[in-house]
Each structure stands twice: as structure tokens, then as C-alpha cells.
A protein has these predicted regions:
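SDR active-site lid
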Residues: 165-240
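Substrate-binding pocket helix/loop in short-chain dehydrogenase/reductase
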Residues: 65, 87-88, 95-97
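Residue(s) in the substrate-gating loop at a strand-loop-helix junction
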Residues: 132
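Conserved NAD(P)H cofactor-binding loop of Rossmann-fold oxidoreductase domains
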Residues: 79-84
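Conserved glycine-rich cofactor-binding loop
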Residues: 9-10
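Conserved glycine-rich Rossmann-like NAD(P)H-binding loop of the short-chain dehydrogenase/reductase
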Residues: 23-38
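Active-site helix of classical SDR
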Residues: 111, 148-151
Length: 263
């Protein structure tokens, strides 16, 4: 299959692209910036992959979106995303909007373009959206990120049910990574800490909040990305109606327990 992955310059997106290429798929790995594109092209070239191409695709950029429309792909993995930290009370509206612009609206836009292309050309295909366990379980001072991921998961749920009416071979899946040591969560926690300024009602607790967030993610995070990459590969290749792909196992169990106890 011909697969496009957004946000593939590093971490989960990068490793997923390599594994899918190793399994014989043709993979388009995309990056947010031109600099990332150059670096990733060098990496791919050094690894000797002939079935991988690298493209710059800023999912918020209208020019790049026009370029995306020209790709003839079977699978879209909407992986690109950002994490904006900060209290709901403190966070400025522009930061919240930008978090949703990347994680929700831009992801929605790509999905809409991709699916309309499949439908108009009478093709089968798969849309895989990377959400997060944070879209189900709330994390204090990361409300913007949690909310954006909850929104994209719900959109995918509705989309999955709508597609059924078309009687097409189009599969919609959501991947929910738990905590992994990719650097993403660390940056988000730092941004949460930076957002607590002297005029914040949380300022006196700033150090305590930062330490608690770091401890939570330090205890929960896994170094190996293997478990979540396996789930994404399954979402690409499995012939079933499974919707949510979640890993690691311990956090999958925690999500189930939380669902039982939250009310």
C-alpha cells in the first residue's frame, strides 16, 4: 500500500515509517519544516530505503495542503500534533486556538481531503488518526492538549459511523499512545511550567506542580516505542473493524479502570 505519515521527522512517526517500509509498503514520510525535511532525507538515504520518500508538509500551511491533494495514497496516518501546556485559567486563547488548529482542525482538513478523494475515485483505503490516552483521561495543566485529542477522537467516532452509510471499503481507526519517552511530553510539561507566571493563582504552587507532572510522566513513560508502532502497523494491515488501537498495556488497563471509576 501507499502510505503517507504526517509528523514523521522523529519519534513514533519516524519509526512507524521505517517499519512499514520494511514490510514492503511505499511510504511518504512528511515533516513540519524544510530543515527537518533535509535532515530526514539524509537519514533515509543513509539507511538505503528505496520505497520511502520525504516531503515537507506543514498541515497548517495552505500551499502544503495543495501539494497534499496531489498525492495518490491508500492510507493516511494523521500523526502530526503539538502539546500546549498550561492551566485552563491561565492559558491565553491564542495558544488554545493554535493547539486545536494543529491537533484538530488541520487533522480534520487532511482527513476530509483524503476521504473525498477515495470516494470520488471509488477506492478503498484507511484513515488512521493519532489521538492520545490524554483524550480520555484528564491531566491537570495539560487541558488544552487533552481537549484537542478528545475532540479528534470523537470526530473519528462519528466519521466511522457515517462512512458505514456509503458501503465503501474505508476503515477509520484511532491510535491512542500512552506515555513514551520521545521528548514530546517533556516539552509540553515545560510549557505548562512556563505558563505559570507571577500573576497566576497557581504561582505559589509552581514548583510543586512541575515536580508532580514530571514524576507522573517519568513513572509512566516507556523508552521503547515498539509497542505503539506495532499497534499502528496493525491498524494499517489488519482486516477487521477494530477502531481504537492503544498501547502500552499497563496504560490500556488504567484507561479501563478510569472508565469504570470516573463517575
Amino acid at each position: 500500500m501507499k502510505i503517507l505519515i504526517t509528523g514523521a521527522s522523529g519519534g513514533i512517526g519516524f519509526l512507524t515509517g521505517l517499519v512499514l517500509a520494511q514490510r514492503g509498503h511505499y511510504v511518504i514520510m512528511t515533516t513540519h519544516t524544510k530543515k527537518q525535511e533535509v535532515v530526514l532525507k539524509e537519514k533515509i538515504s543513509s539507511l538505503g530505503y528505496s520505497n520511502v520518500v520525504v516531503e515537507k508538509l506543514d498541515i497548517t500551511n495552505s500551499y502544503d495542503i495543495e501539494k497534499f491533494k496531489k498525492f495518490d495514497i491508500d492510507v493516511l496516518i494523521n500523526h502530526a500534533g503539538i502539546g500546549v501546556g498550561g492551566s485552563i485559567i491561565d492559558l491565553d486563547i491564542d495558544s488554545l486556538r493554535y493547539n486545536f488548529e494543529v491537533n484538530f482542525f488541520s487533522s480534520y482538513n487532511l482527513a476530509k481531503i483524503f476521504l473525498n478523494n477515495l470516494i470520488s475515485n471509488n477506492k478503498s483505503g484507511r484513515l488512521i488518526i493519532t489521538s492520545s490516552i490524554a483524550g480520555t483521561i484528564p491531566f491537570e495543566f495539560l487541558g488544552s492538549y487533552c481537549s484537542s485529542k478528545a475532540a479528534i477522537t470523537m470526530m473519528a467516532r462519528v466519521l466511522k459511523d457515517e462512512i458505514k452509510y456509503l458501503d465503501r471499503n474505508i476503515k477509520i481507526s484511532v491510535v491512542e499512545p500512552g506515555a513514551y519517552k520521545t521528548g514530546f511530553n517533556e516539552v509540553m510539561i515545560d510549557s505548562a511550567n512556563d505558563s505559570i507566571e507571577e500573576d497566576s493563582p497557581f504561582f505559589d504552587k509552581k514548583e510543586e506542580i512541575y515536580d508532580i507532572l514530571k514524576l507522573k510522566f517519568s513513572l509512566a513513560s516507556l523508552h521503547s516505542l515498539k509497542s505503539i508502532v506495532i499497534q499502528i502497523v496493525l491498524a494499517v494491515e489488519e482486516d477487521n473493524k477494530k477502531f481504537i488501537y492503544l498501547s502500552p498495556f499497563i496504560q490500556r488497563m488504567f484507561k479501563k479502570i478510569y472508565a469504570l471509576l470516573k463517575y
